[in-house]
Amino acid sequence: MPHSYDYDAIVIGSGPGGEGAAMGLVKQGARVAVIERYQNVGGGCTHWGTIPSKALRHAVSRIIEFNQNPLYSDHSRLLRSSFADILNHADNVINQQTRMRQGFYERNHCEILQGNARFVDEHTLALDCPDGSVETLTAEKFVIACGSRPYHPTDVDFTHPRIYDSDSILSMHHEPRHVLIYGAGVIGCEYASIFRGMDVKVDLINTRDRLLAFLDQEMSDSLSYHFWNSGVVIRHNEEYEKIEGCDDGVIMHLKSGKKLKADCLLYANGRTGNTDSLALQNIGLETDSRGQLKVNSMYQTAQPHVYAVGDVIGYPSLASAAYDQGRIAAQALVKGEATAHLIEDIPTGIYTIPEISSVGKTEQQLTAMKVPYEVGRAQFKHLARAQIVGMNVGTLKILFHRETKEILGIHCFGERAAEIIHIGQAIMEQKGGGNTIEYFVNTTFNYPTMAEAYRVAALNGLNRLF
């Protein structure tokens, strides 16, 4: 006789991965509950990560644009805004996102339960509710989509009022004049752009020898130059020895012997999976040192009825990919296998000022693979649309095979890069000979547009062939 469960599946977490899984499951007729420990749905992406940081970035970039445009500014009075004012803008966006996502669950009759979940046995969860009560829930299958949080080394006092991580920085109430950012990954670089755009002095401490080493080197170099040109001080190959919080700021002692002092510190070096409170040992699951779970191609863990998606499984740790992972896991959970799969070349968007976006291979990868490629470039300053809107800083680079003309990689630095990249991605994904750089020469673009950069870059690249 089959066992009776409260739900067909329980999804732990309502971020992009959890939402993708939950929507995929209810569309297939499953009885689903989503457990969210926070008071609102959306997960870290909506409340502490992607959405607020991008809303901050947008507000700051518009201030920069206003102050640099002689049409609006006589340069005797610069437009300024406090960090608190800009955070209010982010809060408005977060509230809109929360209401919208809450509506998704309600329309699809997907139950939302608030509290902290922990496994009791292979098919049972205990839910610690906000009122102190404990509920017991059973399900045939589970999707763990509990996300990640900033990594906290034990020797750094994050209770100090001037030491922040990428979550707590969003509740900063003072106006710093000088910020130390430890960790020059995506989050560190994005916040370096935001603070420098607000005319705050920034020291960016990088534990490696260059910024964002996974990028094409020209894109990484462009960001380094832009930071340097705007006044960000980058310190490569440095690690902290000791971090001291004091009344008027923070002092960082580096292993190289240097000492740095600033009004506050943003520690942005690594993230940890939110798995420590799930009691995974009760179902025989183990995480790695970063609290992450290993999964197979269908996002199953070592327990076949337990799936995991999003930040909790590590790479690529993108909201866009997490949603698709959830959707694929939902298909595998119901049907036993998934026909859908993540695309091979996942686009990357980095919301510095200016933006960086890429898809496909870098020049360094193609050179190492001994692929005969050529490069086509378009400088934004040569595009009519960029001249009209004052977006002269930027470039689009297309890497393509010299013989087959197949597009192998696209890299963009400049405002709207994360949007521009998708035009090229759409052609790269074409099968049966559809992926060719000649498409951009043979098609007609609206004029004037930023998309025209593809035609300019394609002509530039094809003219190099002989």
From Swiss-Prot:
Co-factor binding comment: Binds 1 FAD per subunit.
Disulfide bonds: none
Entry annotated with the keyword Flavoprotein: yes
Listed GO MF terms: dihydrolipoyl dehydrogenase (NADH) activity; flavin adenine dinucleotide binding; identical protein binding; NAD(P)+ transhydrogenase (Si-specific) activity
Enzyme class: oxidoreductase
UniProt subcellular location: Cytoplasm
GO biological process, one term: cell redox homeostasis
Cofactor(s) the record lists: FAD
Domain of life according to the entry: Bacteria
Catalytic activity entry: NAD(+) + NADPH = NADH + NADP(+)
Enzyme Commission (EC) number: 1.6.1.1
GO cellular component terms given for this protein: cytosol
Annotated keywords: Cytoplasm, FAD, Flavoprotein, NAD, NADP, Oxidoreductase
Function of the protein: Conversion of NADPH, generated by peripheral catabolic pathways, to NADH, which can enter the respiratory chain for energy generation.
Subunit structure: Homooligomer; probable homooctamer.
Classification via PANTHER family: DISULFIDE OXIDOREDUCTASE, SOLUBLE PYRIDINE NUCLEOTIDE TRANSHYDROGENASE
NCBIfam families xref list: PRK05249.1 (NF003585)
Family label: Belongs to the class-I pyridine nucleotide-disulfide oxidoreductase family.
Protein name per UniProt: Soluble pyridine nucleotide transhydrogenase
Gene behind this protein: sthA
